[in-house]
């Protein structure tokens, strides 16, 4: 009897240590989520989850160990129930349970889930029993197929991202040409003042331009219409005006006013 009691105490101590470690890990993780959420990174969250998962697995191993007695065979009976505040209970429960009364005992010493939870569990069990074996197998195969396709897509994206990160990006432009183009557009660097023949302005020697054309056209006769002495209209070349005194022609009343090239209005 004493051997079983010692074994039970040792198992309880080991179980309490594992639960304390799990509680500390949960407390630190909750503190990070509430106070350090702005600096929290996804790798640190994964590390916290991995730590909690490892501690839960260790706790399950302790419970399933062959030297651990079956705690379900042990009976816990409350000896004293009081509505008054218990300081020792407050200290042991870290302020979560101030009193050990009739309202608290059913919640903390219950060995079965709540009646609502039991009802939901029964409903789920009944619904699962209604499904036939063939239909359940088809649903399982469909779910496995969807999961396999999803895992394949995720692994493909990971491989492509890793290969894209290792392979250097191919350059599709020449930086020298880009800089030269920007300098030419912004500052005119590398641009010359060359103009094609015939496009230069008047006054440039050696290049025929608009001034030469206008100078050649200055010799055209200008006809002054009667009644409009200040308006001069240039006549096209090749048009011959009838002169007075020519035989067979009527004397024209139009007077021609021929000016020299220096007096042409466009030659300034």
Swiss-Prot record:
It comes from the Eukaryota. Keywords: Activator, Coiled coil, Nucleus, Phosphoprotein, Transcription, Transcription regulation, Ubl conjugation pathway. Residues 200-209 have a biased composition (Gly residues). One of its GO terms (molecular function) is transcription coregulator activity. Residues 142-151 are annotated as: Interaction with the Elongin BC complex. It is found in: Nucleus. Belongs to the Mediator complex subunit 8 family. This is Mediator of RNA polymerase II transcription subunit 8. It comes from Mus musculus. The lineage of its organism: Eukaryota, Metazoa, Chordata, Craniata, Vertebrata.
């Amino acid at each position: 009897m004493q051997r079983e009691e010692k074994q039970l105490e040792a198992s309880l101590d080991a179980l309490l240590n594992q639960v304390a470690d799990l509680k500390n890990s949960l407390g630190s993780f909750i503190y990070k989520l509430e106070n350090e959420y702005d600096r929290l990174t996804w790798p640190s969250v994964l590390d916290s989850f991995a730590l909690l998962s490892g501690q839960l697995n260790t706790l399950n191993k302790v419970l399933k160990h062959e030297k651990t007695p079956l705690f379900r065979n042990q009976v816990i009976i409350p000896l004293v129930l009081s509505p008054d505040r218990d300081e020792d209970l407050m200290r042991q429960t870290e302020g979560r349970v101030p009193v050990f009364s009739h309202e608290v005992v059913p919640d903390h010493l219950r060995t079965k889930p709540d009646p609502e939870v039991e009802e939901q569990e029964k409903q789920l069990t009944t619904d699962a029993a209604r499904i036939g074996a063939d239909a359940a197998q088809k649903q399982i195969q469909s779910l496995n197929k969807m999961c396999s396709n999803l895992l394949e897509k995720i692994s493909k994206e990971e491989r492509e991202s890793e290969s894209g990160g290792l392979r250097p990006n191919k350059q599709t432009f020449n930086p020298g040409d880009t800089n030269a183009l920007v300098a030419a557009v912004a500052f005119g660097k590398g641009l010359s003042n060359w103009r094609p023949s015939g496009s230069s302005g008047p006054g440039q020697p050696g290049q025929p331009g608009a001034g030469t054309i206008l100078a050649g056209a200055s010799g055209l006769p200008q006809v002054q219409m009667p009644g409009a002495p200040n308006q001069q209209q240039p006549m096209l070349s090749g048009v011959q005006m009838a002169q007075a005194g020519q035989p067979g022609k009527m004397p024209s009343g139009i007077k021609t006013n021929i000016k020299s090239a220096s007096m042409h209005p466009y030659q300034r």
